[in-house]
Regions:
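Gly/Pro-rich active-site loop or hairpin
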Residues: 166
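Conserved Radical SAM active-site core
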Residues: 1-148, 152-160, 169, 173, ...
Length: 189
């Protein structure tokens, strides 16, 4: 996997309307590109402005946490962001892909969203999200946290063909059960 570090200009995207599927007003991608390498990914088809080969090369927004702090701060000079769900992850890159183990941008972003009382909705295919159960429980108590997993199939063999870089469905289903037992709303699609 190739890793490229960049300085981003902004991190949060405001949707024109609240996303009816993910109930989010804002979205963010801490990484561009995704090492999960799912064959059906729309990011692969669209290219999503990824340098290098989609599915193998990942761009890391190394200043994402500084930008997020500035953007979430209610004292900012521009119009402050309304407290509404922030969608973490999506088509441009899974926030819990393998590079997250090294950079921990997602965990740091969650800590900031907790500090500023923003609810979160995380879309992932990775069981690495279990690492952050402590901060997700705090966010859930304060404002709300939702964890969603996507599946191409619940058959481990079929999934291995279409989603070669992700944990098998049985592990993702166990992770959903884990979060449900922790009192965090979960979904799958």
């Amino acid at each position: 996997m190739g890793i490229r570090e960049v300085e981003a200009k902004s991190i949060l995207r405001k949707h024109k309307k609240i996303d009816s599927w993910f109930i989010s007003r804002y979205g963010m991608n801490l990484y561009r590109g995704c090492a999960h390498n799912c064959v059906y990914c729309d990011g692969r088809a669209e290219g999503y402005y990824v340098d290098g080969e989609f599915g193998k090369d990942v761009t890391v927004k190394v200043n994402a946490i500084e930008l997020l702090r500035r953007e979430l701060d209610p004292r900012r000079k521009r119009v402050p962001f309304k407290r509404s769900f922030i969608m973490v992850g999506g088509g441009v890159g899974d926030s819990y892909q393998p590079v997250e183990k090294r950079y921990e941008l997602t965990r740091k972003a969650l800590e900031l969203m907790h500090e500023y009382s923003f609810p979160v909705h995380i879309l992932t295919k990775s069981t690495l999200i279990k690492r952050d159960v402590d901060i997700l429980k705090e966010i859930n108590k304060q404002s709300k946290a939702i964890v969603s997993f996507s599946f191409s199939s619940v058959d481990d063999g079929i999934s291995a063909i279409f989603e070669p870089g992700v944990p098998p469905p049985r592990e993702r289903l166990k992770t959903i059960f884990f979060f449900k037992n922790e009192g965090i709303a979960c979904g799958m699609f």
